[in-house]
Amino acid sequence: MQAIRQWRRPLYLMFKPRPRERAALVRLCAALGIEIVYAPERWHSTLLPIGESTRQAIAAIHEALRVFDAEPFSVAFDHIEGDTLKPRKGQRAPGCFQRALTARIARCGVPLPDYAFSLHLNLAYGGTSVRRAAVPPIEWPVDEILLIESGSGRHVEHGRWPLTVRQAAFAF
């Protein structure tokens, strides 16, 4: 693994809240007095930083994920620290998924930076806040991951992979 550094056009694997949850997050920001200066469409949770965005890196990620088979998982956030939404305690699925994703990418020879995954979602960047509060739970199923180039105040999508349920659920 390589050290994380400042990239001009960083590339990330991430997931984003769905529109309904994004609307709930906008309401939460209003209730908490968080100024929305970062477009809600760009709110995300980073699963894995890749490095500088290049055609080669994008192609390598596409090849690695061509055969990546993973199921959807749920995330739930129930408290805020500063301007960062934090997860409900006890969630194992996001970390398990992230480790499997990292292993798959690394097995395909993609050099990855050192990265300690910690589930969170930043609602604002650049400010400082001592806010600490429980919030009404915001939960959704993560059913796709995105390859995003970030920079200059925008997200450019370079890939999208659905997560597919492999085992049928039965109502009893």
Residue ranges and their predicted role:
Residues M1-F172:
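Histidine-dependent nucleotide/RNA phosphoesterase domain, centered on the 2H-phosphoesterase fold
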